[in-house]
């Protein structure tokens, strides 16, 4: 089982749902504000903002929160956020990419470096691991959104590149550049998605045992708890047997 979305599900079952939701909304609001500040405050005229709003809606973020985040961009006291990508190796040689929006690069770099070091890994230079990933668009629908055939037909018509239907939902893959248009066309056919985002998909996987999997889980959790961190991606591969143990 590749990636760490399954581990996110495990973490959410540990009784931290409310705290996680609050943090997710905070990160979504930051992305909306940055997108609105960089372009038009009208989602119809700003592709990045439109995608950010779509994703916020997919995460059930209240409409008032979304509008407040957009309005914040026009304020004179709004912080200036830099988009920064950090790369390094975690436990077991697992490649990790961290995306952040920060108003203090020194603080964020220090926190992320400390997290890597504590886990037994090491923060590297930009480009040190990203060659093992592809930048893609990923749109996720719940299982009840439609049959496999219906989802496939809608995805093909929208210009998607691949569809992976599982018990947990339908994962629709498209190019990084086309995610805005593809998600818009899918919404017209299938309704609002559960998740719309650009992701780093691993092309090279690193198998890990149970001990290393737990260490990676702790590293990812620590990174995602940082307010500046927007997304974390890792290229580990864990067996279904180990995943079942961690889910127990």
UniProtKB/Swiss-Prot annotation:
Membrane spanning stretches: none
Gene3D superfamilies linked to this entry: 1.10.10.200, 3.30.70.980
Cellular compartment(s): Cytoplasm
Recorded GO MF terms: DNA binding
GO biological process: regulation of DNA-templated transcription
Keyword Endoplasmic reticulum tagged: no
Top-rank taxon: Bacteria
Keyword Zinc among record annotations: no
UniProtKB keywords: Cytoplasm, DNA-binding, Transcription, Transcription regulation
Pfam family, one: Transcrip_reg
GO cellular component: cytosol
Protein family (similarity comment): Belongs to the TACO1 family.
Protein name: Probable transcriptional regulatory protein BH14810
Organism, as annotated: Bartonella henselae (strain ATCC 49882 / DSM 28221 / CCUG 30454 / Houston 1)
């Amino acid at each position: 089982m590749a990636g760490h979305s399954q581990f996110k599900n495990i973490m959410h079952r540990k009784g931290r749902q409310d705290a996680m939701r609050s943090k997710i909304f905070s990160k979504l609001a930051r992305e909306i504000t940055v997108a609105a500040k960089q372009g038009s405050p009208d989602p119809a005229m700003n592709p990045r903002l439109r995608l950010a709003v779509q994703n916020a809606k997919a995460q059930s973020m209240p409409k008032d929160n979304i509008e407040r985040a957009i309005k914040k961009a026009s304020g004179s006291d709004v912080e200036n956020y830099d988009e920064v990508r950090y790369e390094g190796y975690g436990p077991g040689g697992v490649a990790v990419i961290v995306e952040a929006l920060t108003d203090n690069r020194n603080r964020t770099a220090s926190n992320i470096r400390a997290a890597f070091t504590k886990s037994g890994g090491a923060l590297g230079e930009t480009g040190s691991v990203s060659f093992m990933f592809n930048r893609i668009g990923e749109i996720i629908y719940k299982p009840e959104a439609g049959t496999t055939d219906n989802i496939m037909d809608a995805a093909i018509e929208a210009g998607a590149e691949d569809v992976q239907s599982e018990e947990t939902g339908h994962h629709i893959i498209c190019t990084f550049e086309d995610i805005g248009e593809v998600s818009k066309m899918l919404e017209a056919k299938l309704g609002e998605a559960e998740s719309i985002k650009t992701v780093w998909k691993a092309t090279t996987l690193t198998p890990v045992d149970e001990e290393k999997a737990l260490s990676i889980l702790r590293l990812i959790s620590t990174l995602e708890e940082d307010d500046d961190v927007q997304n974390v991606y890792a290229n580990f591969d864990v067996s279904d047997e180990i995943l079942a143990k961690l889910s127990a």
